[in-house]
């Protein structure tokens, strides 16, 4: 399809530059969960602001992360909740789909992104979409109203979560906590110390250790 253009460039870099020439109806961030600092860059306040700058007035930003179907414990709730809080600090309208993967749809318009099955079915039929893998009836399976309400209420109830930023990657931190819980590791105890401590308090002993290490190496080499 000649209408499709592929740009081999870092996503953040592309979004920063795209606003100067183009506006988009939809931005779909199709990347893995923020399990690394690199991936976390696409779930931060700064990225959502940059994406918002290149969206049309009724445009939609969509992304998704792994979640849980029937129960959001502390780790999962904080994880997906931090993304919701961060997106909602940029976009007035954010909705989240239920399921093993939570899909987030954010917009400046309250009319574009919706989970209303009748509205979605009407749009699907009007556009004449033809697919052997999807039909308008699938909306009932993907978006049962009870499940939609459940995930929305659960995420909105996570008050006081910090916004995820480039310099304070809390969503990355919550992802680590979630994986620690899933694997039964004891790393979570150490991570919680980082959560309660100020960054400077953590960096000072690391800096002192590095200085001592450098001094030791210099002195040791001179003694040879």
Q: PLM features: what roles do these ranges have?
A:
Residues 1-84:
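The AdoMet/dcAdoMet-binding core of the Class I SAM-like
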Residues 2, 10-17, 21, 89-224:
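Soluble small-group transferase modules, centered on the S-adenosyl donor enzyme superfamily
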């Amino acid at each position: 399809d000649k209408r499709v253009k592929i740009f081999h460039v870092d996503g953040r870099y592309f979004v920063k530059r795209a606003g100067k020439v183009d506006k988009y109806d939809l931005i779909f961030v199709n990347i893995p969960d923020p399990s690394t600092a690199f991936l976390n860059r696409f779930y931060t306040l700064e990225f959502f602001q940059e994406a918002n700058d290149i969206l049309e007035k009724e445009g939609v930003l969509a992304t998704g992360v792994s979640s849980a179907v029937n129960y959001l414990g502390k780790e999962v709730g904080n994880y997906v909740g931090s993304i919701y809080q961060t997106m909602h600090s940029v976009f007035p309208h954010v909705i989240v789909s239920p399921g093993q993967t939570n899909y987030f749809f954010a917009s400046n318009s309250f009319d574009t992104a919706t989970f209303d099955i009748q509205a979605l079915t009407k749009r699907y039929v009007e556009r004449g979409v033809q697919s052997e893998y999807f039909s308008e009836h699938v909306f009932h399976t993907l978006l049962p109203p009870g499940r939609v309400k459940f995930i929305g209420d659960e995420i909105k109830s996570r008050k006081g979560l910090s916004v995820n930023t480039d310099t304070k990657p809390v969503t990355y931190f919550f992802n680590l906590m979630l994986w620690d819980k899933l694997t039964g590791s004891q790393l979570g105890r150490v991570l919680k110390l980082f959560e309660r401590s100020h960054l400077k308090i953590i960096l000072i002993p690391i800096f002192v250790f590095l200085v001592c290490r450098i001094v030791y190496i210099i002195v040791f080499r001179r003694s040879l």
